[in-house]
């Protein structure tokens, strides 16, 4: 079989960059170069350098939603499904977590008494829309109508939201839990995350499901259209081809390699 030398990334910029870091020998296409990420855009490599200078010797953990340049300055990269496990395994009693302050606060609570977690002031504009009072009002309103609402939230939400939730997990875990709940007859639920997760749940289950409308659309993730993909595949422009300096790829790959090692 011929080796596939080209990848297309129908997503946000930092995911396309991550694909290039993992497969530097391949041409990676990003059909919508202006499809960024509010969380990734909240931090630059210089911000990480400053944090390291202020906290010498402290390991730096970055969320996957960061640029290649930021990953290159960090010790380990994490996802929403493995960040707790990986941070627990890091040596020492202190760590720096960037850029998501909400996920960082959840990490602080989970590691309380064991590790100090130094945070950065970044956030995802989608998950920042959800607040504790909003969730309480929704639950109260449903309860008045005899509906026992199950709330499933992404860890990028504020700690008040997570406190009001019945389940907290990555997009994949939220989807799996929603499908599991539907299979045992618990059909009334609310997914506190980007709308795409709810769409996937509805597409992948045949059980009766009543998803309350609380999701928020990500304007960046929804930018890419089928026409953009076709155009990029047929005749990509220079800015649609992901280009990262070799040194940045080399340094950023270390943080990803460390993630794979610690996640085992």
Language-model features, listed with the residues they occupy:
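Redox- and metal-dependent alpha/beta enzyme cores, enriched for Fe-S-associated oxidoreductases
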Residues: 105-167, 171-182, 189, 197-211, ...
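General beta-strand structural signal in soluble alpha/beta enzymes
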Residues: 9, 29-32, 60-64, 69-72, ...
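C-terminal functional extensions of proteins
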Residues: 155, 173, 193-205, 209-264
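Active-site beta->alpha loop and helix N-cap motifs at the rims of alpha/beta catalytic domains
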Residues: 16-54, 58-78
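Short active-site oxyanion
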Residues: 6, 56-59, 92-95, 147-150, ...
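Single conserved hydrophobic/aromatic residue that forms the stacking wall/gate
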Residues: 1-8, 12
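Active-site glycine-rich loop that binds ribose-phosphate moieties when present
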Residues: 41-50, 69-90, 97-103, 119, ...
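Long, charge-dense
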Residues: 29-55, 119-128, 213-226, 232
């Amino acid at each position: 079989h011929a080796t596939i030398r080209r990848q297309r990334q129908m997503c946000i910029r930092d995911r396309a960059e991550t694909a290039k870091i993992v497969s530097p020998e391949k041409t990676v296409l990003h059909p919508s170069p202006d499809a960024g990420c509010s969380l990734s855009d909240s931090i630059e490599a210089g911000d990480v350098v400053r944090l390291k200078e202020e906290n010498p010797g402290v390991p730096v953990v970055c969320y996957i939603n960061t640029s290649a340049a930021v990953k290159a300055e960090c010790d380990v990269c994490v996802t929403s499904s493995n960040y707790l496990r990986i941070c627990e395994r890091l040596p020492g009693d202190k760590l720096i977590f960037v850029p998501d302050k909400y996920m960082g606060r959840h990490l602080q609570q989970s590691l309380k008494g064991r590790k100090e977690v130094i945070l950065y002031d970044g956030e995802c504009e989608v998950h920042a829309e959800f607040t504790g009072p909003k969730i309480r009002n929704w639950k109260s309103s449903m309860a008045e109508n005899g509906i026992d609402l199950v709330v499933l939230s992404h860890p990028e939400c504020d700690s008040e939201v997570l406190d009001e939730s019945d389940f907290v997990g990555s997009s994949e875990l939220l989807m799996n839990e929603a499908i599991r709940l539907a299979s045992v007859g618990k059909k009334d639920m609310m997914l506190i995350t980007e709308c795409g997760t709810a769409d996937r749940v509805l597409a992948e289950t045949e059980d009766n499901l009543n998803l309350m409308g609380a999701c928020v659309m990500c304007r960046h993730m929804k930018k890419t259209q089928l026409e953009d993909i076709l155009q990029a595949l047929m005749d990509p422009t220079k800015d649609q081809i992901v280009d990262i300096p070799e040194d940045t790829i080399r340094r950023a790959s270390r943080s990803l390699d460390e993630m794979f090692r610690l996640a085992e």
